[in-house]
Amino acid sequence: MSVFEIKHPLVQHKISLMRAKDMSTRSFRQLSAEVGSLLTYEATKDLELENFQMEGWDGEITGQRLVGKKATVVPILRAGIGMLDGVLELMPSAKISVVGLYRDEETLEPVTYFEKLAGDIDQRLALIIDPMLATGGSMNATIDILKKAGCNDIRALVLVAAPEGIEKVKSAHPDVDIYTASIDDHLNESGYIIPGLGDAGDKIFGTK
């Protein structure tokens, strides 16, 4: 397992803006998509290409195109939806698989209430998207669902991650790489990431 903390200046600038207490829903939503797009760029750097011949404006040229596994984007509902448009900007043909989870506020454990996966997910690269990797419970539950469906090429894209969540995913799924804009300090007693972003779902959907 590898953890990639993306230190690109644009990523760091945008994730810092998202931490502001007075961030509007519109701005938070837009930045979630933008950082999601930048994380997708980093997470797909190793996709396989092949050469092919094509007609250019001045005759035949050699181009390159993607080959190998196609992708499916897996937003964890509901907050993962906030990153989806940004991912699809770069991968508009990707199928969308959906996993719905909520965190039990007493046990902090994930509860699955919905899942709808691409029919051929066992043949696809899965990009799980969720703004927060906090305790790691929701991420592990989603990975479990994907693996049960036969998908074994999985990457996780999160805006911010807590060290505790990273370790939990690493322990359960050492084959899954994580891409994040920031590895934050710790979880508080309520299971929220510090300094974190607050409740990303509420901020994206305007229900805070």
From Swiss-Prot:
Pathway participation: Pyrimidine metabolism; UMP biosynthesis via salvage pathway; UMP from uracil: step 1/1
GO aspect biological process, one term: UMP salvage
GO molecular function, one term: GTP binding
Keywords, in A-Z order: Allosteric enzyme, Glycosyltransferase, GTP-binding, Magnesium, Nucleotide-binding, Transferase
Cofactor requirements of the protein: Mg(2+)
Pfam families: UPRTase
Binding-site positions, uracil: I193, G198, D199, A200
Coiled-coil ranges per UniProt: none
Cofactor note: Binds 1 Mg(2+) ion per subunit. The magnesium is bound as Mg-PRPP.
Activity modulation: Allosterically activated by GTP.
Catalysed reactions, semicolon-separated: UMP + diphosphate = 5-phospho-alpha-D-ribose 1-diphosphate + uracil
Keyword GTP-binding: yes
EC number(s) from the headed UniProt entry: 2.4.2.9
Keyword Transferase recorded: yes
SUPFAM superfamilies attached to this UniProt entry: PRTase-like
Function text: Catalyzes the conversion of uracil and 5-phospho-alpha-D-ribose 1-diphosphate (PRPP) to UMP and diphosphate.
Protein name: Uracil phosphoribosyltransferase
Naturally occurring in which organism (per UniProt): Colwellia psychrerythraea (strain 34H / ATCC BAA-681)
